[in-house]
Design a protein with these regions (language model features):
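Nucleic-acid endonuclease domains
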Residues: 1-68, 76-222
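Acidic/His-rich structured neighborhood in mature extracellular/periplasmic domains
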Residues: 72
Length: 222
């Protein structure tokens, strides 16, 4: 009987996955320039890798998280522009986080024109606890206001300037809640769209040790 997947096992598996799958040439990857197609390919490959070793509940992007048993979503993105999208559920997600963990694979793709095969080199892989999935500039700004004895009016004005998607009444209620319960500093860049647009450059280049962020494969900048 297989063991149940947990966060520690997930992180260890991701490290092994990046090591054994980097620079493996595959005919299925040749000529693919669509980041979404590459992402789907890697997600399925990683899920299969996990399922071979552990008992886990599978999900998919259509009905929720990729790995609901560990409250984690898989994100796969190119080093050229490390970003992805996620469903918008609540305007508070930008302040208090998405409500689930992320495991982010960042790759560089190369094609072998002679053999008609493509390969992915995983340059970075990071596990981000749900507590760190809020927007960096928004949470830093809120902490600065609170530390400088700001009040609910100051926070409301800041939220309005940051274009947090909510009406005036909701924004002011949020401002009062934030004053009582300041958010943890997030490390994503989250912008508004029909879905949230998540950007990971800060995560990829992070040098400091931050609780809740585990560097599985550290980007060396090359």
């Amino acid at each position: 009987m297989k063991e149940a997947l947990d966060t520690e096992k997930l992180i260890n598996c991701a490290r092994k996955f990046c090591s054994c799958q980097s620079k493996v040439y595959r005919s299925e990857l040749f000529g693919i320039t669509d980041g979404k197609a590459v992402g789907t390919f890697v997600e399925h490959l990683f899920k299969d890798f996990l399922a071979q070793q552990y008992d886990l509940t599978m999900g998919n992007s259509a009905n929720g998280l990729d790995l609901p048993s560990v409250n984690t979503d898989i994100k796969v993105t190119s080093i050229k522009q490390p970003q992805s999208s996620c469903p918008y559920k609540d305007s508070k997600q930008r302040i208090y986080g998405l409500g689930y963990n992320l495991i982010v694979f960042v790759y560089q793709k190369e094609d072998d024109e002679t053999n008609k095969k493509g390969m992915l080199n995983f340059l970075s892989c990071t596990y981000i606890d749900s507590s760190r999935t809020a927007d960096y500039q928004t949470t830093i700004g809120l902490h600065n206001i609170i530390n400088n004895k700001g009040n609910a009016d100051d926070i409301y004005a800041f939220l309005a300037d940051r274009n947090i998607p909510a009406d005036e009444v909701t924004l002011y209620q949020m401002a009062q809640d934030i004053l009582k319960n300041p958010p943890t500093i997030g490390y994503l860049t989250i912008s508004n769209a029909l879905q949230w647009r998540l950007q990971y450059s800060r995560i990829v280049s992070l040098e400091d040790n931050v609780s809740g962020i585990t560097s599985i494969v550290k980007y060396d900048g090359k």
